[in-house]
């Protein structure tokens, strides 16, 4: 069975893979995450997921090791505009104001790379926020949670109270669509429900 490497420092993605019984090692890769001119959001997240997986595989091959590398990327999209991680407080508050009382898209791409090639899936979800008062948004920003989150919120954290409805995969909004990820892993010969950390699933 191939070893799985996660090309991400995201603790959320690591926890999701552990949840479905997939042992892994973490590889930290760095790629240029700037959108290309006129790049569609779905194409953007898929390109980044593939790029992270390919960069991780190149790192493995450079060490003379084999394995499968998983890359993923999540973006929040509203009015066709990609909301990345906020650069500062003003940016974070502007994101929350844009999302307040409205529906937005969350796009998550997952890619698996091995010596035989790269396969990817893109999953779209729709999330609706209730109205978020400015003072709430400020308190939320001051919690520290939004600073490193795409779109400036975490559905699995304190930001859950803003979400009135979700259509699609909850785990994809968190950062990894588990149904599609499990299908990809199976294609690459990696089963779910393995013992992780010495405990049976």
UniProtKB/Swiss-Prot annotation:
It catalyses: dTTP + H2O = dTMP + diphosphate + H(+); UTP + H2O = UMP + diphosphate + H(+). The record marks 12, 74, 156 as: Important for substrate specificity. The active site is at residue 73. Pfam families: Maf. The lineage of its organism: Bacteria, Pseudomonadati, Pseudomonadota, Gammaproteobacteria, Pseudomonadales. It comes from Pseudomonas aeruginosa (strain ATCC 15692 / DSM 22644 / CIP 104116 / JCM 14847 / LMG 12228 / 1C / PRS 101 / PAO1). This is dTTP/UTP pyrophosphatase. GO terms for biological process: nucleotide metabolic process. The keyword Hydrolase applies. Its cofactor is a divalent metal cation. Its main location: cytoplasm. CDD domains: Maf. Keywords: Cytoplasm, Hydrolase, Nucleotide metabolism. It is found in: Cytoplasm. It is an enzyme of class 3 (hydrolase). GO terms for molecular function: dTTP diphosphatase activity; nucleoside triphosphate diphosphatase activity; UTP diphosphatase activity. One of its GO terms (cellular component) is cytoplasm. The keyword Nucleotide-binding does not apply. Nucleoside triphosphate pyrophosphatase that hydrolyzes dTTP and UTP. May have a dual role in cell division arrest and in preventing the incorporation of modified nucleotides into cellular nucleic acids. InterPro entries: ITPase-like_fam, Maf-like.
